[in-house]
């Protein structure tokens, strides 16, 4: 189990208090592209075309972390 897999497991167990930089690191490890056109949101796009937009404000709400985990593991977006 790699570092990003462990981070996903931690996110699944506790979806609170995550930063956008941590999500970007996991996305890089999983080969998921992201873009941040402004400062308020980041859009993650899975290679299968599924996407998820996450507000970049801290703390990130747990519902977005749950959706992010689902995007990384199953390729299911919004």
Indicate where each model-derived feature is located:
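Minor-groove-contacting beta-hairpin "wing" of winged helix-turn-helix DNA-binding domains
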Residues: 41-45
């Amino acid at each position: 189990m790699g570092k990003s897999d462990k981070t996903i497991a931690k996110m699944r167990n506790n979806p609170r208090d995550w930063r956008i930089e941590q999500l970007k690191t996991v996305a890089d490890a999983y080969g998921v592209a992201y873009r941040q056109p402004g400062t308020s949101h980041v859009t993650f796009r899975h290679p299968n075309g599924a996407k998820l937009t996450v507000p970049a404000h801290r703390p990130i709400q747990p519902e977005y972390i749950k959706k992010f985990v689902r995007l990384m593991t199953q390729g299911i977006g919004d």
